[in-house]
Swiss-Prot record:
This is Large ribosomal subunit protein bL31B. Keywords: Ribonucleoprotein, Ribosomal protein. It holds the Pfam family Ribosomal_L31. Part of the 50S ribosomal subunit. It comes from Ralstonia pickettii (strain 12J). InterPro entries: Ribosomal_bL28/bL31-like_sf (IPR034704), Ribosomal_bL31 (IPR002150), Ribosomal_bL31_B (IPR027493), Ribosomal_bL31_sf (IPR042105). One of its GO terms (molecular function) is structural constituent of ribosome. The lineage of its organism: Bacteria, Pseudomonadati, Pseudomonadota, Betaproteobacteria, Burkholderiales.
Amino acid sequence: MKEGIHPNYREVVFQDMSSDFKFITRSTIQTKEMITLDGKEYPLAKIEVSSESHPFYTGQQKVLDTAGRVEKFRNKFGSKIGKAAK
């Protein structure tokens, strides 16, 4: 590998802004902010969604009623489309 062309791979704290959940992982992300966690200073990357706040992982997801939407569409436009094609 060539020297000086690879990004710095280091430990970084990712903070979920919606739930204030923080976790440490390794990344090459460039950040300007720093945070102290467990007595050690790390670069800080702020994110909007993590497994702590995403509806799929928290069990708070909504199920869309697509069958009702399709039936509503067919009731409104179904007969018009069939007549126009003839």
